[in-house]
C-alpha cells in the first residue's frame, strides 16, 4: 500500500470512529431523557421497570393523602379505577393538587411497588385531564365516572349553574 492510500485510509477510519462516537453519545443522551408513561394497572402488574425514571398518572384517591408533620414528605395513592399505586414525594405539591383530581408523577419505582417521585404535575384547570390519564381511565372503563373532572357522585357547579 502506498503512503497516500494509507493516509486516506487512516483519515476515513478516524472520521468513521468520530461519527460512531457522536451517534453513540447522542443515543445515550436521548435514552436518558425518555420517560415512559405507565398506568397504575401496568405498575401493579409488574410491567413498569424498577430503578428507571418513569411517569405514572391517574386520579388521586380520596382520603389517601398523608402529610408528614415535621417534613415535606407526602404519600398518596393514584388510581386508574382498576388498580392503585402509592406515590411518595418530598417537596411542595402544586397548588392545583387535590384528591379526586388527575396528576402525573415522575420518579423511580422501588422494589416495594412505591413510586418515589421527584416531580408531581397537577392538571391545569377543572376541565383538563392529561391525555395519558384520560386513556388509562377509558381503558379501565372508569372515564364515565370522572367526566369533566368529577368523581362519581360529586356535584360540580360550573358557570351555567349546572
Swiss-Prot record:
Q: Has UniProt tagged this entry with the keyword Heme?
A: yes
**What GO MF annotations does this protein's record show?**
heme binding; metal ion binding
User: Could you list the residue ranges that cross the membrane?
Assistant: 9-29
Q: Which residues bind heme?
A: 124, 128
Name the principal localization, coarsely classed.
membrane
Where is it located?
Answer: Cell inner membrane
Residue ranges, Periplasmic compartment? 30-162
Which portions of the chain have biased composition (kind: Basic and acidic residues)?
139-148
List the Pfam families.
CcmE
What residue spans carry the region label Disordered?
Answer: 139-162
BP GO terms, sorted:
cytochrome complex assembly
Q: Which InterPro entries match?
A: CcmE (IPR004329), CcmE-like_sf (IPR036127), NA-bd_OB-fold (IPR012340)
Q: How does it sit in the membrane?
A: Single-pass type II membrane protein
Tell me its family.
Answer: Belongs to the CcmE/CycJ family.
Q: What is this protein called?
A: Cytochrome c-type biogenesis protein CcmE
Q: Species name for this entry? A: Pseudomonas paraeruginosa (strain DSM 24068 / PA7)
Amino acid at each position: 500500500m502506498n503512503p497516500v492510500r494509507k493516509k486516506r485510509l487512516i483519515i476515513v477510519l478516524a472520521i468513521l470512529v468520530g461519527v460512531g462516537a457522536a451517534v453513540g453519545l447522542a443515543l445515550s443522551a436521548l435514552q436518558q431523557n425518555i420517560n415512559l408513561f405507565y398506568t397504575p394497572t401496568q405498575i401493579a402488574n409488574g410491567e413498569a421497570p424498577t430503578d428507571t425514571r418513569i411517569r405514572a398518572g391517574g386520579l388521586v384517591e380520596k382520603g389517601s393523602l398523608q402529610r408528614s408533620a415535621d417534613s415535606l414528605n407526602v404519600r398518596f395513592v393514584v388510581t386508574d379505577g382498576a388498580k392503585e399505586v402509592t406515590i411518595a414525594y418530598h417537596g411542595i405539591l402544586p397548588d392545583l393538587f387535590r384528591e379526586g383530581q388527575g396528576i402525573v408523577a415522575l420518579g423511580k419505582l422501588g422494589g416495594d411497588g412505591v413510586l418515589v417521585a421527584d416531580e408531581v404535575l397537577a392538571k391545569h384547570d377543572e376541565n383538563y385531564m392529561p391525555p395519558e390519564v384520560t386513556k388509562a381511565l377509558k381503558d379501565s372503563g372508569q372515564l364515565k365516572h370522572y367526566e369533566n373532572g368529577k368523581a362519581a357522585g360529586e356535584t360540580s357547579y360550573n358557570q351555567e349553574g349546572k
